[in-house]
């Protein structure tokens, strides 16, 4: 299974954008019924999502960010959409305990957007109905009055650990709100990648190629991974238990496995380099 790299939000009350989002190159399209839709249009947005899911085409996965399950709207969203074959997963906002995940009719990504959600991250991630977790950083930073990026990194790492311990895919980054600042987006993605985050949600199609490039292995990384994999294959042919690199260093099985993942990701995201 390929882990998504790019996730594109599209407002649920803008159905004319659904097909464009699916054709944007994003791995996952997220129809948003929550923050992007004013209360007066939420019923309309839900109906739009249902109509699209009934006829959807294309290779991108389609998720729906529903309204808070603590509200009647969230439960209505689940009732209307949960049984539709075109829905791959729902994104649940403001998850603060594992109990709210019981009995869901569809796979769920839990969004951790509060102090309570971070504290409960491990139990939420371990819930059998959860297939991924992500951070809602703007709400979280506002609640905690955080302006220091290093403090946010501490919270991000807690969620990275919770996902890994539960055997979930890597945690994607939250949206970068400045659509015009592509250099800032790329730098932010690289910083997130360095602490174990992988992939990112976007709010505009123009952000998709920037995110994709930022999470693609560099030439230096692919060269190093190739060297490790080749050394591992030579050791296996020779019946050697240890893998020695040309520079004399030894690497163990987890390093070899990571090198194989790096090469697989590079071939997926930049196949022209492997032709």
Describe the residue ranges of each PLM region.
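Expand to "…catalyze enediolate/carbanion chemistry for C-C bond making/breaking, isomerization
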Residues: 1-275
């Amino acid at each position: 299974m390929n882990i998504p790299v790019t996730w594109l939000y599209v407002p649920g009350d803008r159905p004319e954008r659904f097909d464009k989002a699916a054709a944007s190159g994003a791995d996952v399209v997220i129809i948003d019924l929550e923050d992007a839709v004013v209360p007066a249009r939420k019923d309309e947005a839900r109906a739009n999502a249902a109509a699209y899911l009934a006829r959807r085409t294309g290779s991108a996965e389609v998720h729906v960010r529903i309204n808070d399950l603590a509200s009647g709207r969230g439960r209505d969203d689940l009732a209307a959409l949960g049984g539709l074959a075109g829905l791959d997963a729902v994104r649940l906002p403001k998850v603060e305990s594992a109990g709210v995940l019981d009995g869901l009719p569809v796979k769920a990504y839990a969004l951790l957007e509060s102090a309570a959600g971070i504290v409960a991250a491990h139990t939420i991630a371990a819930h059998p109905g959860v297939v991924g977790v992500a951070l809602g950083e703007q709400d979280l930073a506002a609640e905690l009055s955080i302006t220091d990026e290093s403090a946010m990194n501490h919270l991000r790492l807690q969620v990275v650990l919770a996902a890994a311990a539960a055997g979930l895919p890597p945690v994607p980054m939250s949206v970068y709100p400045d659509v015009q600042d592509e250099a800032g987006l790329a730098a932010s993605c690289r910083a997130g990648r360095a602490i174990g985050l992988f992939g990112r949600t976007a709010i505009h199609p123009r952000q998709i190629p920037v995110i994709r490039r930022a999470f693609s292995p560099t030439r230096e990384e692919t060269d190093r991974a190739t060297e490790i994999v080749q050394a591992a294959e030579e050791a296996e042919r020779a019946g050697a238990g240890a893998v020695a690199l040309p520079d004399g260093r030894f690497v163990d099985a987890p390093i070899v496995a990571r090198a194989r993942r790096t090469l697989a990701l590079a071939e997926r995201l930049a196949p022209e380099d492997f032709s």
